[in-house]
Amino acid sequence: MTSGQSTSTPRRRRGALLPTLIILVLAIIAFVFFANVYTEVLWFNQLGFGGIFWQQNISKAIIFVAAFLVMSIAVYFSIRIAYRARPVYAPDSQVQDNLNHYQAQLEPVRKVVMIGVPIVFGVFAGAAALGQWQKVLLFLFQVPFGQTDPQFGMDISFYTNTLPFFGFLSGFLIAVVLISGIAALLTHYLYGAIRLQERGIFTSRAARVQLAVMAALFLIILGVNFFLDRFATLQNNGALRSGAMYTDVNAVIPTKAILAVAAGIVAILFIVAAVVGRWRLPVIGAAMLIITSIVAGGIYPWVIQQFQVGPSEASVEKPYIQRNIDMTRSAYGINDVEVIPYKASTTATPGALRQDATTTANIRLLDPNLMSQTFGQLEQYRPYYGFQKTLNVDRYTVDGKSQDTVIALRELNSGGIPAEQQTWYNKKLVYTHGYGVVAAYGNTATADGKPVFMQSGVPTNGKLGDDNSYQPRIYFGQSTTDYSIVGAGEGTASVELDRPQGGDNSSDSKNTFSGNGGPDVGNWFNRLAYSIKFQSTDLLLSDGVNSKSQILYDRTPVQRVQKVAPYLTIDGNPYPAIVDGKVKWIVDGYTTSNAYPYSQQQPLDSATSDSLTQRSGSGALAGSINYIRNSVKATVDAFDGSVNLYAWDDKDPILKTWQNIFPATIKPISEMSGALLSHIRYPEDLFKVQRELLGRYHVTNATEFYNNTNAWSVPNDPTTGDNTKQPPYYMSLQMPGQNAPAFSLTSNLIPQQVGANTRNVLYGYLAADADAGSTQGVKSDSYGKLRLLSLPTDTQVPGPGQVFNKFVSDPSVSSSLNLLKQGQSQVVNGNLLTLPVGDGLLYVQPVYVQSSTGGSSYPTLQKVLVAFGDKIAFAATLSAALDQLFGGDSGAVTGDKDKPTTPGTGGTGGNTGTPGENPDAKAALAKSLQDANQAIKDGQDALSKGDFTAYGTAQKKLNDAITAALAAEGKLDVTAPGSTGAPTGSAPPSTPPTAGSSTGSPTP
């Protein structure tokens, strides 16, 4: 073999290796992409929403291809035309010599550049257009609103569906023309059609024609944009009001029309220049267009605003402000709110609550924001079970009566799997699901402050059924964020850990998933695809995966609904309910828009964020809107993950549009069972947005609205100690104008904060009727009714901040709280509820006590604080506290009336007196406190010596002393007979101790 042959062989091998590696890498990338698409197809098909996947992605593909072709073809032909029209110079001319250097470098790759550059820009254009798929489909399938704007008389759908599409289209076409024009300009310059000379710029005729046409196209599109801007002024967003105001209507809108015509005229001048070969007229025209846009678009409106509107703004802007009020109220569904003047009484008279006995019977004492630890300690059973940080409030019919209920699911907690068992096999095939429903009566507690469960235990049992009446296994929930492999053939041993069994709970039963909950991974191809998707070789190779295996993923209710209905904004608080023998998650979906004319923009994050979202870690909604409807109610089966979408607001034009786009995916309300309807609630996030808007838009008079003297805001939650809003609360109550109590969602409203200070007095109380009825396929007529109690400003009803301040500063309350804080205990304040009863407004706040040490501590209900007007009371039960507050007999019926407790103490707030004489009780109280202090000292000494036995003995003595002190305190009258005292507002407040106390949910 010759030396030439020996050296050429390695070169050929190296030359063949690189293309092979490139092809291999591209093949791997292509298969990974295919695996992700293929698994998505399997997921949607299994769920019965395959049409959603294909319609959505085919639409995206068409939009991508269309944008790619328009951009790439325009750029390609722009370059090609410029290249073909290049001038030819003599070979030895100075011009040709200057160009040869650049052309020589480009020529070897010229064809690649001429094709590659358009493709690159086409890909970017397609990717950008891809994100606008919803705008395109909303335009193509739009349904009219049947309502017109007050300025142009256009249907609202023009603004929500047509105008956004045209805005996208004009912006895209401007980008196409600009990029094509720049490509042509560079090509002409490179090949000498445009060059700089001492006398100016030389352009060949071909270059002049092409660039003039490109400039004319740009100006025509710009003119269309100016014309569309006339309509866009109705979507202007101001800090205090939105829409086209006087200056917009009388200066900006006419100016936009003038600029549109001017742009068209200048475009014609550029076409003329292409023919006659003179640039003077189009250049002058372009300069005049710029000057006109500055003068007419900026200076002229400023002059009108400063000298015509400013001096008489209130009267001049009045009709336009009225437009803003009317359109905002319509867009947010608050135009039918019933405003009820409510002259609230502030005097607590005996028997005042007798007429509201049905409301007081359901006053909720269990705070769902604090009960997670309590549920966990009493009902968790195994560390691999868990409950959400924030539980839910619903209502169930128990013994023929509607009962407000705190409910949660015992979900899988993967973080609780023992460390030594954290293998792939155990995490994916063994620990697959939670088990059972836990529910407690909301209006009562046991003698020692624990929840009274109506549904509990493993196996589950109680008032709501047992394992035979509903499916208790929870495969899909808010905590199930990882995938699981389930299912097996007949005769195969079960491997899924199911639930504890046996009297001592020492063993666990096994189970095999029997539903249809996920895509099939019984064949090797599907297993390979999913092993790539989840980057797991175990999934491909494990013998635990069999021919009947299914893979469950995307398992949270919000994830599942969002994927099958990508056009919806999903409420942040799905909740579980037992419905028709199944546990189902109920999820609220919203159709929204930010293009409704004259409607006020509202950032969702600021409206939906409150102390509850902060505490639970759940995110507030994102984005900014000016139109919202709760158009869809969705359910997700907690066992098999099946999703059903129901058209809750079938009159919503945006929902109708999406139904045209994705037909047969949303079921009519007629298919909702009575059991499901009985658990439908008014959604929290919608209510939060509406209460935020009603703070200002409860005012319907334009002049009063302009003065902004009657603006309200949502108060901060006083129990958290930070500047987070008070969340709305679900409770059953009877509002003025209602014939009977109804499950409702409520919120307080106080004067709007100005600067750093605000008056925390109650100006408004908003309630939404959250009861949809229980008749199959029929929504209650009263559902969603908004009632707003408007309090007169001369009636000083304390707001939640003032009431809470009275609670913590009252001497009697403080002394009792100090007693509860003895030892290593902390006081935890529950939610501060407000109820319109007794012809006034009653505040109720449960008080919990929790150990400040140990991971197994949990809050227990110990006291109840109540307030009415300027008076407060404090007792071990709500019944006792109300009787103290209302002169010994409130007339109320309460859920804890028969609760066996140690008599509690009360404070009077409005009448702070001295304890009644009871020498034996006073002596017993003093002795108990002395024993408690000694026990604390003994415990500290024992800890310092490391004697844990002695420490345990001291803690037992401390608990006994506290129990004895509470018993002695209960025998003392809070107010001596005949004592009147001074009002709380003028009484010197004691400084509440801070050691070991908490104003919110404790951190263990």
Curated annotation (Swiss-Prot):
The chain crosses the membrane at residues 15-35, 61-81, 112-132, 165-185, 209-229, 257-277, 284-304. Keywords: Cell membrane, Membrane, Transmembrane, Transmembrane helix. It is found in: Cell membrane. The keyword Cell membrane applies. Residues 975-1004 have a biased composition (Low complexity). Belongs to the UPF0182 family. Disulfide bonds: none annotated. The keyword Transmembrane applies. Residues 494-517, 891-921, 974-1004 are annotated as: Disordered. Its main location: membrane. The lineage of its organism: Bacteria, Bacillati, Actinomycetota, Actinomycetes, Micrococcales. Residues 904-913 have a biased composition (Gly residues). It comes from the Bacteria. This is UPF0182 protein RSal33209_1243. It comes from Renibacterium salmoninarum (strain ATCC 33209 / DSM 20767 / JCM 11484 / NBRC 15589 / NCIMB 2235). Residues 503-514 have a biased composition (Polar residues).
